[in-house]
Curated annotation (Swiss-Prot):
Name under which the protein is recorded: Lipoprotein-releasing system ATP-binding protein LolD
Cross-referenced SUPFAM superfamilies: P-loop containing nucleoside triphosphate hydrolases
Subcellular location field: Cell inner membrane
Ranges annotated as spanning the membrane: none
Organism from which the protein derives: Ehrlichia ruminantium (strain Gardel)
Keyword annotations from UniProtKB, A to Z: ATP-binding, Cell inner membrane, Cell membrane, Membrane, Nucleotide-binding, Translocase, Transport
Length: 228
């Protein structure tokens, strides 16, 4: 199976003279359609690594490869924006949905941004909202939804441009266990059906065990996790 995403010798340091090492020489390959869970204690560098993976933060050294396109500290903001919009999907613990927009408009927005017509964007958004079982709430405002429903909207939005990989940073962290499992199951099912890769940072070991592979970060070091 082809590699669609890779981290190569990623390091990240902060502070005067880069004295504080957050990520130390992280290497990872994710195959097409593979779901990889990232676990580790609070403050271990999970979110920092996800932000670097999503081209939202710049590593001190090393490269990110997305569909064999290399991104490093010298990659332009314009190229990073292109890659984010066309190959990456994002789901966060705090969804960043637009409160003044309807459910349907929130999911349509990424397609409008890349130049799709309203008709095409609407059709694709309705299809995905049906997938996450929100077809009867298309015109509702975000404020009218429960926490679990909002995360389902966020998942639909992350899928709308058919990304190569979804980066999910604690996507169910604010939900109760039953709702978290329901939301993650929807993401897992669609990713497997469409052969989309997922890189998931989570504290929830029940969700992590549903991944194809688990990696652990501790004190900035990334390693395979085999203690199922």
């Amino acid at each position: 199976m082809s590699i669609v995403f890779a981290l190569s010798a990623i390091s990240k340091s902060f502070g005067k003279n880069n004295q504080v090492n957050i990520i130390i020489n992280a290497n990872l390959q994710i195959k097409k359609g593979e779901i990889v869970a990232l676990i580790g204690p609070s403050g271990s560098g999970k979110s920092t690594l996800l932000h670097i993976a999503g081209l939202l933060d710049t590593p001190s050294s090393g490269s990110v490869f997305i569909n064999n396109i290399e991104c490093s500290a010298t990659t332009s903001d314009r190229e990073k924006t292109y890659l984010r919009r066309n190959f990456l999907g994002f789901v966060y613990q705090f969804h960043h949905l637009l409160q003044e927009f309807s459910v349907l408009e929130n999911v349509m927005l990424p397609q409008i941004i890349i130049g799709k017509s309203n008709e095409v964007a609407r059709k694709n958004a309705i299809e995905l909202l049906s997938l996450v079982k929100l077809q009867d709430k298309l015109l509702m405002s975000i404020s009218q939804l429960s926490g679990g429903e909002r995360q389902r909207v966020a998942i639909a939005r992350s899928l709308i441009n058919y990304p190569s990989i979804i980066l999910a940073d604690e996507p169910t962290g604010s939900l109760d266990n039953d709702t978290a499992l329901e939301v993650f199951s929807l993401l897992h099912k669609y990713a497997k059906e469409k052969n989309i890769s997922v890189f998931l940072a989570t504290h929830n070991h029940i969700l992590a065990k549903k991944a194809d592979k688990i990696v652990q970060i501790n004190s900035g070091t990334l390693q395979n996790y085999t203690d199922y």
